[in-house]
Amino acid sequence: MRLKNFPFFVLFFFFCFNSNQSWGLMSSNQQPQFFKLMKNSLFGDALSTWNVYDVGTNYCNFTGVRCDGQGLVTDLDLSGLSLSGIFPDGVCSYFPNLRVLRLSHNHLNKSSSFLNTIPNCSLLRDLNMSSVYLKGTLPDFSQMKSLRVIDMSWNHFTGSFPLSIFNLTDLEYLNFNENPELDLWTLPDSVSKLTKLTHMLLMTCMLHGNIPRSIGNLTSLVDLELSGNFLSGEIPKEIGNLSNLRQLELYYNYHLTGSIPEEIGNLKNLTDIDISVSRLTGSIPDSICSLPNLRVLQLYNNSLTGEIPKSLGNSKTLKILSLYDNYLTGELPPNLGSSSPMIALDVSENRLSGPLPAHVCKSGKLLYFLVLQNRFTGSIPETYGSCKTLIRFRVASNRLVGTIPQGVMSLPHVSIIDLAYNSLSGPIPNAIGNAWNLSELFMQSNRISGVIPHELSHSTNLVKLDLSNNQLSGPIPSEVGRLRKLNLLVLQGNHLDSSIPDSLSNLKSLNVLDLSSNLLTGRIPENLSELLPTSINFSSNRLSGPIPVSLIRGGLVESFSDNPNLCIPPTAGSSDLKFPMCQEPHGKKKLSSIWAILVSVFILVLGVIMFYLRQRMSKNRAVIEQDETLASSFFSYDVKSFHRISFDQREILESLVDKNIVGHGGSGTVYRVELKSGEVVAVKKLWSQSNKDSASEDKMHLNKELKTEVETLGSIRHKNIVKLFSYFSSLDCSLLVYEYMPNGNLWDALHKGFVHLEWRTRHQIAVGVAQGLAYLHHDLSPPIIHRDIKSTNILLDVNYQPKVADFGIAKVLQARGKDSTTTVMAGTYGYLAPEYAYSSKATIKCDVYSFGVVLMELITGKKPVDSCFGENKNIVNWVSTKIDTKEGLIETLDKRLSESSKADMINALRVAIRCTSRTPTIRPTMNEVVQLLIDATPQGGPDMTSKPTTKIKDSIVSDHLTQTRL
């Protein structure tokens, strides 16, 4: 029987063999056609060696091509070849045996449709389309049962996330990072099917809702990244079942709440943990700090309490510890860093106390040491002098005592040393001359004594030097004039004596020079007038002799007050009641008398002529009388100038007429004034005291407070902060002279229809405003809080670059009782942070909230308070009701803007939502906002910065460490 059927088996085998050969032959014949299609539609040097028209060509030798034994293509890897153009459709119709398709890091046409045919590749195991920047919807992957690797990161996919992926049970690597244009979607319970998955990378891809408990079934996971999404609720304790996990990234999910699960401490292979910028509460589990392989622990910007577990000090692997902006108490582990290769430590803005850890840089690798704004006590350990790798050393605003170690001041790579606001004593170490890379040195408000060492001049990269409010004595070293990059020199509030060195005139980059409240004697060097721009304060010293004429004409006379032996030189052409005229030698007096007679005669003749003209021009008498009034009122003004600008103060006063009014605001009336030089300035006449019966003493107090604020504003130098030229003050009126902004303010541009701002311009405005506020918050000490961020206080120059205006003025005007558009506090309804409305206490996070409202204005085109939001609604509440669906998100966007901008606008909206969180600690800092907005730069826009890496590597640290503590 078997022999009888044998011929049929032979025939069947022969048929199948020939069929396979025929199929292979047919497929092999189709392959050249697809290579020709690729050659014709893709462009790049890498394909120049593809000779597709030669009949004898072996395609298997082409770049990126691999074949099996029958010559059938199995791998097509064109990654990183800088190709452009269109990838042809139907790749698997031509390559049916294809196992690997990698097209990552190319510049393919965004509208390419080839992706829709990919599910036909039933044998495909590895699909990589990362950083191709494709658009459109994603296909159904359910038929691709062989798929092991899928990487669709850094694209612009829209529509629904393909949940069918979670049925591909052989999947090992899943990456959809940075797809912010997808619809909001929730991680399904079916994720538990992916038991072979080692990498789940779903950062910034519109995930929302809770993290499912079933995620605990993915026991093969090595890397779990869900950062930058809208996840909410508590972190499930089942994550503690992921025994192979090495990296856990959940940061920037600001609706995550609850405590950190103790069970995470079960993950003995875990190396990196980042759950920053969320709403976590409770303490840091000891079990986490005891993990044997922990390298990175970042939990900053939460509401964590309690002490830092002592077990963290025993770690042998810890490199980066970032816990800033929490409510942590107690002491740092005393042995922190003694056994581990620490690179960065930032525990700033907590309530930590006790001594600083002595051996934190024992490994010799520490780059960043930041412990600002805590309650640390004791001295700075001598061992810190051996931290030769340090780049930033910031211990400001603590309770440190003792002397400054020589070694700390001679660190060869350090760029910032910040010791301000402590109780440090002793001299400035001479070793400061060895800090060749030092750019910023802050030592203000300590008890430092001795002299300023001349070795300081060796630190030629210094840009900022603040030694104010100490007990320094002796002369100002002439060698300071060698610090040619210096733009801030503050020595105020010491016991410095001798004369002001002429060499200071070499500091051509200087913006701020404050030598006030010392014991300086002698004359003021005439050549100091060469410093441009100038903000000078020499008040409260023992200076004598004439004030340089150029400084008088620059309106800087007030900067020399409380120097009773100073005088006004006759050549100044005017006198100031605060200073006497300088006495002239006898010979010059006689000559002066002759000149006085000649001038008197000239004035008499001129008076006769004027009288005649007035008789003939009686119709202009009212105007002339007004001029006389202005002229007389001029002498009642105090004038303070902050920049060199050529104008006669009388010009300003004469131009304050109705026809020059360009706007009214909560703080006053704004005039456009064209000077004789042709330059145009803006003059803001601040609202005067509303209570006319107020005591003169009260008025003087308020004016003094305003003057203090204005002098601070006048010292500011930043491209996104409006330049304040001058300030006029009297008991009844205050004038601010600003640079003129020809395109008005942002409110008018957005809401009055004067101009159409495309998204790219709006984004530019948002970044500029954020950079200006970041400067006020993070680059000044102490920080300046604006208190009244709103679109009317954002001015636009000729190129629509934004300039922040009116910062610091609001709180003084509130005391005057006249700011009609503000609430009881400084600030404007619709822009006020919720906690400010309750507590009346302004913080930098209040400014962040107000900026978030402005950003929403830019994105939606709507006003902060509008009837379209319904009863008791504002723009923040309205947006919060729309973000649960993709349709809702689209509905919030300004309909006047092009469809192509929607994705970029949604990216920016995510930033605005973070800024307007009701919990202040959840809001990012303005430095972080700048980075977030730069990351959201419209496609094709300027390359403002490189993309941040999504993981912490050995060679880098968090954005906060590298960018925000400046």
UniProtKB/Swiss-Prot annotation:
Residues 937-966 are annotated as: Disordered. The keyword ATP-binding applies. Residues 656-934 form the Protein kinase domain. Residues 1-22 form the signal peptide. Its EC number is 2.7.10.1. GO terms for biological process: floral organ development; lateral root formation; nitrate import; positive regulation of lateral root development; regulation of anthocyanin biosynthetic process; regulation of lateral root development; regulation of lignin biosynthetic process; regulation of root development. Disulfide bonds: none annotated. GO terms for molecular function: ATP binding; peptide binding; peptide hormone binding; peptide hormone receptor binding; peptide receptor activity; protein serine/threonine kinase activity; transmembrane receptor protein tyrosine kinase activity. Disruption phenotype: Defects in vascular organization and phloem differentiation in inflorescence stems, characterized by aberrant accumulation of highly lignified cells, typical of xylem or fiber cells, within the phloem, and phloem cells sometimes adjacent to xylem cells. Malformed vascular cells files, probably due to defects in oriented cell divisions or cell morphology, and leading to both phloem specification defects and disrupted xylem vessel formation. Short inflorescence stems and increased anthocyanin accumulation in leaves. Glycans are attached at N61, N109, N120, N128, N167, N217, N241, N269, N301, N437, N527, N537. GO terms for cellular component: plasma membrane. It is found in: Cell membrane. It is a single-pass membrane protein. The active site is at D788. The modification Phosphotyrosine is found at Y738, Y775, Y831, Y838. Pfam families: LRR_1, LRRNT_2, Pkinase. Residues 614-966 are cytoplasmic. The chain crosses the membrane at residues 593-613. Residues 23-592 are extracellular. Keywords: ATP-binding, Cell membrane, Developmental protein, Glycoprotein, Kinase, Leucine-rich repeat, Membrane, Nucleotide-binding, Phosphoprotein, Receptor, Repeat, Serine/threonine-protein kinase, Signal, Transferase, Transmembrane, Transmembrane helix. This is Receptor protein-tyrosine kinase CEPR1. It comes from Arabidopsis thaliana. The lineage of its organism: Eukaryota, Viridiplantae, Streptophyta, Embryophyta, Tracheophyta.
